[in-house]
C-alpha cells in the first residue's frame, strides 16, 4: 500500500533484531544471536508475497497460501539489509540487497571494517549486483560548548536505556526503559564523553563536514542522520537545521 500511495517510492528495510527483551515477548526461547536465521528465511517470502499467492512450510516460518494486497507498483521493491557481520553481508549480496551498517559508538575503524566486509561479499556473490552502502550514526550539530554538553548528556542517557534492552538488564515501565548506569556496565569506556564526541557525528558544522568526508572517501553512498538521542525538541530542531543549512550544501 505504501508503494502505491507514494507512486512507487517504497524502499524496504529488514534486519535481524537487536533486543533480547523483544525476542522474549515475540518468540519466547529465541536467542538474540539466532535472529538472523529467521530473517534469512523471511526475506524471500516477503518478496514472493509481493508477487502473488505463496504457501510456506519452512524451518522457522509456516503459513497457508497468502499474498500481499494491493501489490507494489514497482516490479522489484529495493531492499535494504542491516548488516554488521560477514554472514549478513554475504546474505545481502546473494539476495541482491542494498546494505545499511551502524557502528554503534565505535570509531571510524569500525566503518572501515564494514566496508571491507561489503567488498568481500560483493566479490563472493559475483552476481553483477552493486549495492548502495548506507552508514547510520547518531548526529548532533552545535555551535558552542553548551550544545556539546547537552548532546553528550542526552546520548549517554539513551545509551543506558539501549544497554537495558540489548542485554535485558533492567525493567521497562509504561514503554520507557530504565536507564542502566553506564558506570555499572562492562565495557563502559565506550561511553566516555570525549570518545563519543570523536566517534559520533557530533560537532560544529565544519567538524561534521570533515567527519562525513571521511565516510564519503571510504565509499559510503548514503548517510543516515540518527536523531534519536534524547535531545529536547528545540535542541534537536536546531541541530537538524544546522545540518540542513550548513552541512548538506558541502555535499551537493
Could you tell me what each predicted segment is?
Residues 38, 42, 240-252:
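Alpha-helix-loop-beta-strand connector modules within alpha/beta enzyme cores
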Residues 22-23, 102-108, 226-239:
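Glycine-rich, proline-tolerant flexible connector loops at the mouths of alpha/beta enzymes
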Residues 143-149, 234-242:
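Short glycine/threonine-rich loop-to-helix capping motif typified by GTGT followed
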Residues 3, 72, 155-157, 240-245:
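Short, electropositive alpha-helical surface patch
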Residues 32-68, 109-220:
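An alpha-helical appendage that flanks or caps ligand/catalytic pockets
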Residues 10-14, 79-82, 97-102, 131-138, ...:
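Hydrophobic faces of well-ordered beta-strands that scaffold small-molecule active sites
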Residues 1-97, 109-112, 116, 124:
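Internal, glycine-rich beta/alpha segment that forms the wall or movable "lid"
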Residues 16-20, 85, 105, 139-141, ...:
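Active-site-proximal loop/turn and secondary-structure-junction residues that shape catalytic pockets
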Amino acid at each position: 500500500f505504501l508503494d502505491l500511495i507514494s507512486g512507487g517510492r517504497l524502499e524496504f528495510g529488514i534486519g535481524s533484531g537487536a533486543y533480547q527483551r523483544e525476542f522474549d515477548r515475540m518468540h519466547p526461547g529465541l536467542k538474540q544471536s539466532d535472529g538472523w536465521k529467521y530473517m534469512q528465511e523471511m526475506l524471500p517470502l516477503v518478496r514472493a508475497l509481493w508477487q502473488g499467492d505463496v504457501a510456506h512450510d519452512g524451518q522457522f516460518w509456516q503459513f497457508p497460501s497468502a499474498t500481499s494486497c494491493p501489490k507494489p507498483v514497482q516490479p522489484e521493491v529495493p531492499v535494504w539489509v542491516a548488516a554488521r557481520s560477514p554472514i549478513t553481508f554475504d546474505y545481502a549480496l546473494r539476495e541482491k540487497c542494498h546494505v545499511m551498517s551502524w557502528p554503534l559508538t565505535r570509531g571510524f575503524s569500525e566503518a572501515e571494517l564494514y566496508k571491507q566486509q561489503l567488498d568481500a561479499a560483493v566479490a563472493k556473490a559475483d552476481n553483477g549486483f552493486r549495492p548502495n552502502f548506507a552508514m547510520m550514526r547518531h548526529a548532533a550539530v552545535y555551535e558552542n560548548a553548551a550544545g556539546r554538553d547537552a548532546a553528550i548528556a542526552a546520548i549517554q542517557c539513551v545509551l543506558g536505556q539501549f544497554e537495558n534492552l540489548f542485554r535485558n538488564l533492567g525493567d521497562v515501565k509504561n514503554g520507557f526503559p530504565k536507564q542502566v548506569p553506564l558506570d555499572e556496565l562492562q565495557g563502559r569506556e565506550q561511553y566516555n564523553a570525549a570518545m563519543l564526541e570523536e566517534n559520533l557525528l557530533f560537532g560544529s558544522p565544519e567538524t561534521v563536514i570533515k567527519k562525513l568526508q571521511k565516510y564519503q572517501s571510504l565509499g559510503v553512498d548514503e548517510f543516515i542522520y540518527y536523531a534519536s538521542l534524547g535531545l529536547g525538541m528545540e535542541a534537536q530542531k536546531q541541530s537538524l537545521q544546522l545540518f540542513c543549512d550548513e552541512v548538506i550544501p558541502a555535499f551537493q
